[in-house]
Structures are given as structure tokens and as C-alpha cells.
Amino acid sequence: SGSCTLRTCWKKMPHFREVGDRLLERFNGAFKVMAGNDGKSVVPVGHNIKPPDKRDLIYSADSPDFCMANRKTGAPGTKGRLCNSTAMDMGGCDLLCCGRGHREETMVLEENCLCRF
């Protein structure tokens, strides 16, 4: 008589939040690089920076400044936009106003609610 053994292996994706956290960590530690003289390698821009390894996130061009209006790209900038003074996310004044400060305004809106009694 013989015996049979079956073994199945698979890789499982981590939770979506974990993937996002890892990407953010790599984004925050990304290296700016320029092409090496051999045309195949990259060289980090800056002094005393270790060369990136294959798991590091690298970039070669700086992101545009979305805070300021740019006619060339059509970016409107953030000056004059409404923001939420209590929010800590993308719509919050601290981030959206790009450190320029902001003015708080309280508005009272009266609207006909079409209520029937």
C-alpha cells in the first residue's frame, strides 16, 4: 500500500491598509536620482546619500507646486479656495492653504425648506 501527500502553497495579499502604509513609508523616504554616466544606473542627488536599492522608491523630477497657480499647466493653485478649519485631511486649511494662513468666516444661510405643517 502507498500513501499520498498533497501540499498546496500560496501567497496571500496583505490587508489594503497595510499596503497603503508601506507605500506611504516608501514615498516619504523616496530618493531623487539622475541617470548615471553609463546610461543604465542611477545616482542619488545630494551629498552623503546611500545609493537606493531595488526596493526603494526613486524619482527624477520634482513634483510641481500645486499651491501656486501655473498658467502653463492650467493648475489653479489653492489661493482663495474654501477649506475646513477643523479637518486634518486634504480639505483642511493647514494643508490646503500651504502655510499662507487663512481667514475664518462664519456664514448663516437661510433657505426655504418647503416644509408643511
From Swiss-Prot:
Q: Which UniProt keywords apply?
A: Developmental protein, Disulfide bond, Extracellular matrix, Glycoprotein, Lipoprotein, Secreted, Wnt signaling pathway
Going by the entry's taxonomy, the superkingdom of the source organism is recorded as: Eukaryota
Against SMART domains, the record matches this protein to:
WNT1
Q: How is it modified after translation?
A: Palmitoleoylation is required for efficient binding to frizzled receptors. Depalmitoleoylation leads to Wnt signaling pathway inhibition.
**Which GO terms of type biological process are on file?**
canonical Wnt signaling pathway; cell fate commitment; neuron differentiation
Q: Which residues are glycosylated?
A: N84
Which terms does the record give in the GO molecular function aspect?
cytokine activity; frizzled binding
Where does the record place the O-palmitoleoyl serine lipid attachment?
S1
Mind naming one GO cellular-component term on file for this protein?
A: extracellular space
Gene3D superfamilies in the cross-refs: 3.30.2460.20
Q: List the disulfide bonds.
A: C83-C98
Localization, per the record, is: Secreted, Extracellular space, Extracellular matrix
Family of this protein: Belongs to the Wnt family.
Q: What does this protein do?
A: Ligand for members of the frizzled family of seven transmembrane receptors. Probable developmental protein. May be a signaling molecule which affects the development of discrete regions of tissues. Is likely to signal over only few cell diameters.
**What name appears for this protein in its UniProt entry?**
Protein Wnt-6
* Gene that encodes it: WNT-6
